Amino acid sequence: YMRLGRKIIAYMVTRTFSGLLYEMDLRLRPNGQSGLLVSSESAFEQYQQQNAWTWEHQALIRARFVAGCDRVAKRFKQIRHAVLKQSRDSHALRKEVIEMREKMRSTLLNQKPGYFDLKHGVGGIVDIEFIVQFGVLENANNHPALLVYTDNIRLLDTLNKIGFLSDSQQKGLNEAYQAYRKASHHASLAENPKMVLVEEVEHHVQLVTSVWDEMIING
C-alpha cells in the first residue's frame, strides 16, 4: 500500500502545460515525514487526542472527508468534532497561535520592497486564517455550530453570529480574504509570485492587522 500511495501521489503532483495538477503537502500527516502515509482510525484518533500540536488542530479545522465509504466518513467526523470541541485554556492557546504565526513568517515571508506577500505578509491570508482558527478552538466547546463548516468565509459568518467577531470585523475580514484569494489565483494562473503592490491592498492590511491585534495580541 505504501508503494501504491506514492504512485498515486506522483500522478497527483504531475506538472502539466497548464501548471501543477494538484498541490499536496504530506508533511501535515500525523508524525510528519516520519509517519505512515495512511493511519488507522484508532491511530489517527489517538494521535489527535494525545500527541498533536495546536497547529495540527488548527489544520483539522479545515479538514474534510473527500472520498470513501460512509462509515469512515462518519467516524472521521466524530473524531474531528471530539478533538475540536475540547475545552482549552485561552491564554495558552493564544500564546501558541502567536508563536506559530511568528515562526511561519520568519521562514516563509517573501519580502520585496514596495510589494506585499498575500499569504504570509502582516495582515495577509494566514493572519485571517489564524484569527478564524483561534476563534474556533477557543469557542467550539460551547458553540458546536463552529464545527459544521470548514471554509473560512462561512466560519467568519459563524464567528460573527456567536459574538466573537463584530459585524464590521466580519465584513472587513471577509472582503480582505476574498480580495487576497482573487489576487492569489490570478498570480497562480500567470505563474507569478503571490505578491501585489502594497497600495493595492493597504486598506485590507490595516483592517486585518487591527483585528489581529485586538483579538489575538491584546485579547
Regions found by a protein language model. Name each.
Residues 1-219:
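A nucleotide- and high-energy phosphate-metabolite-utilizing enzyme signature
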